[in-house]
């Protein structure tokens, strides 16, 4: 393990919620919850003001609404988050070529590799500068952890939250870890935590004391060894610039279980098309088609089929997914469907029949305006005006949807650079009101946030699991 | 029953008949081989409800009769026997095999429970064994191997008067072979989809005979069956249901370029560069006037490049293929010179054989191969 705290972990503070607060002045200092707003939606992120009420991410939306009834509930604007994330990642890449993004709002950076820092002092300087730069470019805050290993850097950034910087000086790691609860360590969730507690182990220090053999006896070989090493603050995992994408998949949770077999088939076809679009967008193809079905009773099945050659042909994926669906009993109804492609490659074996048929339909069918999650909404109006999304009024200018229903839509006219704006209500079909692209959070930065997006993003009730392999960078794995 | 038969004759017949014995018999009697002795002939039959096989050999019959014994065991025994006449006799529920100083006593299975073998459909025509075997070999190579689309695991046999067309595809290539035969009825017209694997085994087994009889039931009795007979062996196979997709329109008729390459050096070169093409990653072919450059591998891993002489008429082209599919085709054309015709790098290429560089392509066999599209 290195001797200087030159691994940096950046974690943006309440990222989605902070973006919303930055772009909507009326929400600053208020409880904001971003996530799927359907009956089966979950919280993606909530602002610190909302956390006071006990709301946290991954909580069912209904529970969040009970805990914080007066918070603002918004549908995520992924295009905007993605573009801001790109600005942040660009800043990180200026620091070092070794940047390992974990999600839109989190990444590891190896400062040593870029020559940005060699010791504790320069590392702290780099971290402080990064936080200032992020603030200037995006207007948002991020917390930075600095340590000699990935695990500790992440623990440090957790301790730094919100809007802080924590550096763990090498040599002090074990003393710092010792009193911490075992749940601090990555890989220790509720189950392992309970297991250890029953064995009388509640702190990291106690893991170290228990010894490796005891850990292996309790948790098995792989987990036991790994956990013991971590308790001694030993973590040799390097920062890896581009993690290989291993699969591409999409899934939807439905507000109401689908019973109709034909409808299930239609949804699977639609998911297959969406999955192929993602696959193509990253220049990939794959050999194995995976279908995931969660039934009314939460029993979850996955079925897969491997083709002889990799494909990115929507017809082939749709066909394979349909064949896989044939082998699944859906009589009780399904609450979730997913289609994925793995065994990725960067070439495609053309298919005679699909090409012959595909001369009719080269591209995957365009996503229809109605998304499954919203298909059950009482009126088509609500589909067009998702809460939190941007709109433009010919006279009143830029604003965002505060809510809609009963044929009306309420818009607050404000921009990231204005003061708190006024609220006006319109008929949902008011011709002067159109969906708009998000505005950049900071008026004068080059590129990024203001890039055009294709109107309001349609979203399923729960967040789509986009990249099973993490990263998101267009990486390739060769089978 | 009591018979005497030459050891080699017996061993060969048993081995062939036992090949279609089911590995996991659905009923115990189906693990048996039915031996029937009558009129100077010993016939051996096996059946697994899909395929039936029957072979007749000359034997000295002392007492006619029928017996059902474990096929695997009889195959193992007859293979291991010394080269002396073999005597098989039955006594109640036991069968005895005596050869030289060895003596085996086998349990018999109940003959009356053994299903009747399907009737051989009426003979419809004959074809020389060699022609049939090579045609099947050329076509079956392109058949699908997994059961996701059962239709694609078959070889389509289409009979139109005196011409027979075999076709099969796994959706990545499409092989078609035509040959002439002697039909009983010159106006015959029939189509059958035969499991490729069975057809390959059958064709191989029947090469020894001069002529192979193809028996395909048009309608009525024996429908859904095809029979083959030659060299004292006859076998029937259940047909697959369904038909291959229409393929005439899949074969392009106009090309932008035609390449002519000597097959042997081409095959050698593909095999060599494919060494770095792990898991059938593509081999890339770039044709320019007078030369073909083959490449495989990627800059992350190993790479290989090789040049081969080639004649090209038309536009230069770069195209990539799964090396296995390409090699399958090159071996199937069975010609000293290969002709590859292209439209574009994403459209199917047509492979056929030429007897010599300056000869016309042999129209009897066509191998359509889908390219691999490289992204980026």
UniProtKB/Swiss-Prot annotation, chain A:
Its EC number is 2.7.7.7. Belongs to the DNA polymerase type-Y family. Residues 7-189 form the UmuC domain. SUPFAM superfamilies: DNA/RNA polymerases, Lesion bypass DNA polymerase (Y-family), little finger domain. Its cofactor is Mg(2+). It comes from the Bacteria. The active site is at 106. The record marks 16 as: Substrate discrimination. Keywords: Cytoplasm, DNA damage, DNA repair, DNA replication, DNA-binding, DNA-directed DNA polymerase, Magnesium, Metal-binding, Mutator protein, Nucleotidyltransferase, Transferase. GO terms for biological process: DNA-templated DNA replication; error-prone translesion synthesis; SOS response. Binds 2 magnesium ions per subunit. It holds the Pfam family IMS_C. Residues 381-396 have a biased composition (Basic and acidic residues). GO terms for cellular component: cytoplasm. It is found in: Cytoplasm. GO terms for molecular function: damaged DNA binding; DNA-directed DNA polymerase activity; magnesium ion binding. It comes from Streptomyces coelicolor (strain ATCC BAA-471 / A3(2) / M145). Monomer. InterPro entries: DNA/RNA_pol_sf (IPR043502), DNA_pol_Y-fam_lit_finger_sf (IPR036775), DNA_pol_Y-fam_little_finger (IPR017961), DNA_polymerase-Y (IPR050116), DNApol_IV (IPR022880), IMS_HHH_1 (IPR053848), Rev_trsase/Diguanyl_cyclase (IPR043128), UmuC (IPR001126). Mg(2+) binds at residues 11, 105. It catalyses: DNA(n) + a 2'-deoxyribonucleoside 5'-triphosphate = DNA(n+1) + diphosphate. CDD domains: PolY_Pol_IV_kappa. This is DNA polymerase IV. Residues 357-400, 430-479 are annotated as: Disordered. Poorly processive, error-prone DNA polymerase involved in untargeted mutagenesis. Copies undamaged DNA at stalled replication forks, which arise in vivo from mismatched or misaligned primer ends. These misaligned primers can be extended by PolIV. Exhibits no 3'-5' exonuclease (proofreading) activity. May be involved in translesional synthesis, in conjunction with the beta clamp from PolIII.
UniProtKB/Swiss-Prot annotation, chain B:
Gene3D superfamilies: DNA Polymerase III, subunit A, domain 2. Its main location: cytoplasm. It comes from the Bacteria. It is found in: Cytoplasm. Transmembrane segments: none annotated. Keywords: Cytoplasm, DNA replication, DNA-binding, DNA-directed DNA polymerase, Nucleotidyltransferase, Transferase. One of its GO terms (molecular function) is DNA-directed DNA polymerase activity. One of its GO terms (cellular component) is DNA polymerase III complex. GO terms for biological process: DNA strand elongation involved in DNA replication. Forms a ring-shaped head-to-tail homodimer around DNA which binds and tethers DNA polymerases and other proteins to the DNA. The DNA replisome complex has a single clamp-loading complex (3 tau and 1 each of delta, delta', psi and chi subunits) which binds 3 Pol III cores (1 core on the leading strand and 2 on the lagging strand) each with a beta sliding clamp dimer. Additional proteins in the replisome are other copies of gamma, psi and chi, Ssb, DNA helicase and RNA primase. PANTHER family: BETA SLIDING CLAMP, DNA POLYMERASE III SUBUNIT BETA. Confers DNA tethering and processivity to DNA polymerases and other proteins. Acts as a clamp, forming a ring around DNA (a reaction catalyzed by the clamp-loading complex) which diffuses in an ATP-independent manner freely and bidirectionally along dsDNA. Initially characterized for its ability to contact the catalytic subunit of DNA polymerase III (Pol III), a complex, multichain enzyme responsible for most of the replicative synthesis in bacteria; Pol III exhibits 3'-5' exonuclease proofreading activity. Belongs to the beta sliding clamp family. This is Beta sliding clamp. It comes from Streptomyces coelicolor (strain ATCC BAA-471 / A3(2) / M145).
């Amino acid at each position: 393990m290195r001797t200087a705290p030159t691994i940096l972990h950046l974690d943006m503070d309440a990222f989605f919620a902070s973006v919303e607060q930055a772009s909507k002045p009326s929400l600053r200092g208020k409880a904001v919850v971003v996530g799927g707003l359907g009956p089966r939606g979950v919280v993606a992120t909530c602002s610190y003001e909302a956390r006071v009420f006990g709301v946290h991410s991954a909580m069912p939306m209904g529970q969040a609404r009970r805990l914080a009834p007066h918070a603002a509930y918004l549908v995520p604007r992924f295009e905007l988050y993605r573009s801001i994330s790109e600005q942040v990642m660009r800043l990180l890449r200026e620091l070092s070529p070794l940047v390992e993004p974990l999600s839109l709002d989190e990444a590891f950076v190896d400062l040593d590799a870029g020559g940005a820092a060699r010791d504790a002092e320069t590392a702290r300087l780099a971290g402080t500068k990064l936080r200032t730069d992020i603030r200037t470019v995006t207007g948002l805050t991020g917390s930075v952890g600095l340590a000699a290993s990935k695990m500790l850097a992440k623990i440090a950034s957790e301790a730094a939250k919100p809007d802080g910087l924590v550096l763990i000086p090498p040599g002090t790691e074990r003393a710092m870890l010792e009193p911490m609860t075992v749940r601090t360590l990555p890989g220790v969730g509720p189950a392992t935590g309970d297991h250890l507690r029953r064995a009388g182990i509640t702190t990291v220090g106690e893991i170290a004391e228990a010894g490796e053999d005891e850990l292996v006896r309790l948790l098995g070989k792989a987990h036991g060894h790994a956990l013991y090493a971590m308790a001694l603050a030993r973590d040799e995992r390097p920062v890896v610039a581009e993690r290989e994408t291993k699969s591409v998949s999409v899934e939807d949770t439905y507000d109401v279980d689908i019973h109709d077999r034909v409808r299930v088939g239609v949804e699977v076809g639609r998911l297959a098309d969406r999955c192929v679009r993602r696959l193509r967008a990253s220049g990939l193809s794959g050999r194995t088609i995976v279908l995931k079905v969660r039934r009314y009773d939460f029993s979850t099945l996955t079925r897969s089929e491997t083709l002889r050659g990799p494909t990115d042909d929507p017809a082939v994926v749709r066909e394979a997914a349909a064949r896989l669906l044939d082998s699944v009993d859906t009589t009780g109804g399904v609450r979730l469907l997913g289609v994925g492609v793995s065994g990725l490659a960067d070439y495609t074996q053309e298919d005679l029949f699909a090409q012959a048929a595909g001369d009719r339909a080269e591209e995957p069918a365009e996503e229809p305006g109605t998304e499954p999650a919203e298909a059950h909404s009482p009126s088509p109006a609500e589909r067009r005006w998702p809460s939190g999304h941007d709109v433009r009024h010919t006279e009143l200018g830029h604003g965002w949807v505060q809510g809609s229903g009963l044929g009306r839509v309420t818009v607050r006219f404000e921009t990231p650079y204005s003061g708190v704006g006024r609220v006006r209500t319109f008929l949902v079909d008011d011709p002067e009101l159109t969906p708009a692209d998000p505005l950049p959070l900071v008026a004068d930065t080059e590129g990024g946030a203001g890039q055009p997006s294709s109107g309001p993003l349609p979203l399923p009730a729960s967040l789509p699991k986009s990249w099973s392999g993490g990263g998101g960078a267009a990486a390739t794995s060769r089978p | 029953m009591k018979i005497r038969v030459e050891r080699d004759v017996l061993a060969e017949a048993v081995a062939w008949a036992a090949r279609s014995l089911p590995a996991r018999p659905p009923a115990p009697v189906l693990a048996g081989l039915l031996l029937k002795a009558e009129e100077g002939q010993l016939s051996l039959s096996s059946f697994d409800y899909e395929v039936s096989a029957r072979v007749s050999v000359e034997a000295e019959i002392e007492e006619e009769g029928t017996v059902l014994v474990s096929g695997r065991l009889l195959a193992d025994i007859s293979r291991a026997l010394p080269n002396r006449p073999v005597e098989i006799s039955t006594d109640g529920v036991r069968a005895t095999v005596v050869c030289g100083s060895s003596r085996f006593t086998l349990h018999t299975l109940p003959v009356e429970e053994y299903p009747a073998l399907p009737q051989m459909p009426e003979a419809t025509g004959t074809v020389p064994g060699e022609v049939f075997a090579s045609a099947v070999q050329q076509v079956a190579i392109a058949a699908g191997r997994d059961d996701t689309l059962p239709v694609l695991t078959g070889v389509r046999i289409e009979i139109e008067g005196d011409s027979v067309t075999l076709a099969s595809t796994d959706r990545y290539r499409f092989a078609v072979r035509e040959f002439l035969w002697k039909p009983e009825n010159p106006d015959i017209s029939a189509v059958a989809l035969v499991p490729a694997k069975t057809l390959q085994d059958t064709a191989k087994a029947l090469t020894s005979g001069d002529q192979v009889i193809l028996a395909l039931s048009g309608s009525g009795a024996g429908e859904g069956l095809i029979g083959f007979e030659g060299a004292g062996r006859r076998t029937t196979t259940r047909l697959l249901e369904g038909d291959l997709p229409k393929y005439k329109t899949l074969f392009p008729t106009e090309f932008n370029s035609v390449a002519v390459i000597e097959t042997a050096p081409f095959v050698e070169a593909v095999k060599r560069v494919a060494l770095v093409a792990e898991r059938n990653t593509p081999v890339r072919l770039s044709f320019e006037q007078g030369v073909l450059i083959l490449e495989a591998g990627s800059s992350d891993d190993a790479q290989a490049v090789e040049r081969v002489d080639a004649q090209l008429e038309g536009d230069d082209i770069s195209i990539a293929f799964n090396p296995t599919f390409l090699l399958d085709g090159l071996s199937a054309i069975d010609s000293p010179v290969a002709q590859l015709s292209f439209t574009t790098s994403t459209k199917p290429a047509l492979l056929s054989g030429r007897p010599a560089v300056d000869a016309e392509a042999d129209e009897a066999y066509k191998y359509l191969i889908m390219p691999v599209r490289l992204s980026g």
